[in-house]
Swiss-Prot record:
Keyword vocabulary terms for this entry: Aminoacyl-tRNA synthetase, ATP-binding, Cytoplasm, Ligase, Nucleotide-binding, Protein biosynthesis
Family, as annotated: Belongs to the class-II aminoacyl-tRNA synthetase family.
HAMAP family: Gly_tRNA_synth_beta (MF_00255)
Organism of this sequence: Streptococcus pyogenes serotype M2 (strain MGAS10270)
Gene Ontology MF: a single term: arginine-tRNA ligase activity
EC top class, as a word: ligase
Protein name: Glycine--tRNA ligase beta subunit
EC number: 6.1.1.14
NCBIfam families: glyS
KW RNA-binding (keyword) present: no
Catalytic activities: tRNA(Gly) + glycine + ATP = glycyl-tRNA(Gly) + AMP + diphosphate
Subcellular location, record wording: Cytoplasm
Main location as per UniProt: cytoplasm
């Protein structure tokens, strides 16, 4: 007869960003534990609040399934001695399995007999197996952990309760310094300690203590309450998904309310207001029906609506203090001169091993000038890039960015416009930070894109040059994100700038502040980012073939990946790739100094293939270029069918290998086709 299992771990408040991943991890780890221990179940449901992680297993078998395993031992000739008795090898084998030689039987495997034993293990009761669930809790991993009291162990937060129920029976377990039972804790202010009467009553028992344990239900409550406020007040509320996910993990019993602030603060840039409300106070932004910011906000209380007016006033007071700071910095920063701020950047450290921000900007300016030419920017755009590169970090020394660092670049754009800088320059100051997250927005202007590329390239090369190279998951300076940004920007703008030649040219530059080193590591790092970009849709063999090509032009590589993926589903893909692979493999034996001599051709097939290679222009899109190369497949096959490439005559052999080398030289600009898998 199946039962339902409940496990709840009660803790001090968890960081909001940890709650949802930890809830998921607990469910996955418990499912693995049950499967590995042969306890079948029907369903697993997880729960979480800032103060608890829980999981309920429905339809849990009351006993493990029986286990029958066959074990293969030594060969019969080793298992028996000269007298036909079991040898020490055979005896040791069965003893290791907890059996005796009586269990031995011989089975033939590929013409030879081997010792086999069959071990039967009766399933244990579920209650006995579940004593091991503390292993699941101990195995949980978190971004940070802590010690508390005088304990030697550490965990994400101090543990207060452990509830383990099999239907309505409490199981006796010990985890860290806690003994399990059926007691849980209600809402910190509105509830008390409470008894969970059964696994099935979990939600109801805690609801009576003002705790909504289902995160999805809390989210729905918050959204519904906000929608009600929208209707009542005739406004629109920006329900930012990331903020919503954070807020629902800050509360156990949500109550949304609307507060207000003086309209005079609307004169502050909208980004400052939104940052103050959303990022610092976890408030939802309120707009009118036309989308204009209103002097209101929506917040979510961890509790009911008792004394809600006092709560509203308290939140308003806290926000106004933030807005006062924003208003002050907005006013005072406008008194500053960009040139003065730029001059002070010589005293701001970019990194202690690399130098100052001013030196970083100087290198970026040189790189940006080179990129502007490669990207064929207009004279006006080149001028804008150069000016932007001279000043683009100045806002880091403003009071506003000092207080609200999320606004770096954004305030730079605004202050630059107020100071009379060209709009293209101001926009580039903001856009050079983009993309600021995986999948984040890209620069929209060429000037901003070039500055972003230059800034990211110097950052990458500088950190690698002083040995600060990411390893494993450790990437404290976000170099993977910066490099991914480089790849995405190049692809977005379609700039066919060969990365290998570009990086070579950067390593030829000379700076007093820094000498670039570790070029090979940089190139491998960039290749890994391109590989990741292709990996979204392309299998490993296609990615490896493209990365082994003779071209390192990001937009072309990504386009070839897409074209090869599509082509791999067509009928002619396999024969075309196989003929090209054969050519690639033979071409490796060619003498690079040998040029094709048509006078040495002995058959029409040599003439035909050579002419086809000479006429191969590889023009058009990646798909069209691939089609042109694949179209050579019959000609290549005809050549192989009628020509002995590895002829005894050395001149003929070298000439035929040179033909194939010419073919590979052109085809390899698309991909190394012999890396592709056709099985």
């Amino acid at each position: 007869m199946s039962k339902n299992l409940l496990i709840e771990l009660g803790l001090e408040e968890l960081p909001a960003y940890v709650v949802t991943p930890s809830e998921k991890q607990l469910g996955e780890r418990l499912a693995t534990f049950l499967t590995e221990n042969r306890l079948s179940f029907e369903d697993i449901q997880t729960f979480s609040t800032p103060r608890r992680l829980a999981v309920r297993v429905s339809g849990l078998a009351d006993q493990q399934t029986d286990l029958t395993e066959d074990f293969k031992g030594p060969a019969k000739k080793i298992a028996l001695d000269a007298d036909g008795n079991f040898s020490k090898a055979a005896q040791g084998f069965v003893r290791g399995k907890g059996l005796t030689t009586d269990a031995i039987e011989f089975r033939e495997v590929k013409g030879e007999e081997y010792v086999y034993v069959t071990k039967h293990e009766a399933g244990k009761p579920a209650k006995e197996v579940l004593l091991g669930v503390t292993e699941v809790l101990s195995a949980m991993t978190f971004p940070v952990s802590m010690h508390w009291a005088n304990n030697s162990f550490e965990y994400i937060r101090p543990v207060h309760t452990l509830t383990v129920l099999l239907n309505d029976e409490a199981l006796e377990l010990d985890f860290l310094d806690i003994h399990s039972g059926c007691v849980s804790r209600g809402h910190r202010f509105l509830g008390t300690e409470t008894t969970i009467t059964s696994a099935d009553s979990y939600e109801a028992d805690l609801r009576s203590q003002c705790v909504i344990v289902d995160a999805k239900e809390r989210q729905e409550m918050i959204v519904e309450q906000i929608k009600t406020l929208e209707v009542e007040q005739g406004v629109q509320v920006d329900i930012d998904e990331n903020l919503l996910n954070e807020v629902l993990n800050l509360v156990e019993f949500p109550t949304a309310f609307m507060g207000s602030f003086e309209a005079k603060y609307l004169d502050i840039p909208e980004e400052v207001l939104v940052t103050s409300m959303k990022n610092h106070q976890r408030y939802f932004v309120v707009r009118d029906q036309a989308g204009h910011l209103m002097p209101n906000f929506v917040s979510v209380r961890n509790g009911n609506d008792q004394a809600i007016e006092n709560v509203i006033k308290g939140n308003e007071k806290v926000l106004v203090a933030r807005l006062e700071d924003g208003e002050f910095f907005w006013r005072e920063d406008q008194k500053l001169q960009i040139a003065d701020l730029v001059a002070k950047l010589t005293n701001v450290t970019f990194h202690e091993k690399i130098g100052s921000l001013a030196e970083h900007m100087d290198r970026t300016r040189v790189i940006a000038a080179s990129l502007a030419k490669e990207a064929n920017l207009s004279a006006e755009e080149v001028t804008a890039v150069d000016r932007a590169a001279q000043i683009y970090k100045f806002d880091l020394l403003t009071g506003m960015v000092g207080e609200f660092d999320e606004l770096q670049g954004i305030m730079g754009e605004k202050y630059a416009l107020l100071a009379g800088e060209d709009a293209a320059v101001a926009t580039a100051i903001r856009e050079h930070y983009l993309p600021d997250a995986a999948g984040g927005a890209l620069p929209e202007t060429k000037v901003g894109a070039v500055l972003a590329l230059a800034d990211k390239l110097d950052t990458l090369l500088s950190f690698f040059s002083v040995g600060l190279i990411p390893s494993g998951s450790n990437d404290p300076y976000a170099l993977r994100r910066a490099t991914q940004g480089i790849v995405r920007i190049l692809d977005h703008f379609g700039w066919r700038i060969p990365m290998d030649k570009l990086v070579d040219s950067l390593y030829d530059l000379s700076f007093d502040s820094l000498t670039y080193t570790n070029k090979a590591d940089v190139m491998n790092f960039i290749r890994a980012r391109v590989d990741k970009m292709m990996g979204k849709a392309a299998p490993k063999d296609i990615r490896e073939a493209i990365l082994a090509s003779s071209t390192f032009v990001v937009p072309e590589m990504l386009a070839v990946a897409e074209a090869l993926v599509k082509a791999s589903h067509t009928e002619n893909y396999k024969p075309a790739v196989e003929s090209l692979s054969r050519a690639f493999n033979l071409a490796e034996k060619a003498d690079a100094s040998v040029q094709v001599d048509p006078s040495l051709f002995e058959n029409e097939q040599e003439n035909t293939l050579f002419a086809a290679i000479q006429g191969l222009t590889l023009a058009g899109s990646a798909a069209q270029q691939l089609e042109q190369v694949f179209a050579l497949s019959p000609v290549i096959n005809d050549f192989f069918d009628n020509t002995m490439v590895m002829a005894e005559d050395q001149a003929l052999k070298n000439n035929r290998l040179a033909i194939l080398s010419d073919l590979v030289s052109k085809a390899k600009t698309i991909a190394a086709f012999n890396q592709l898998n056709t099985k």
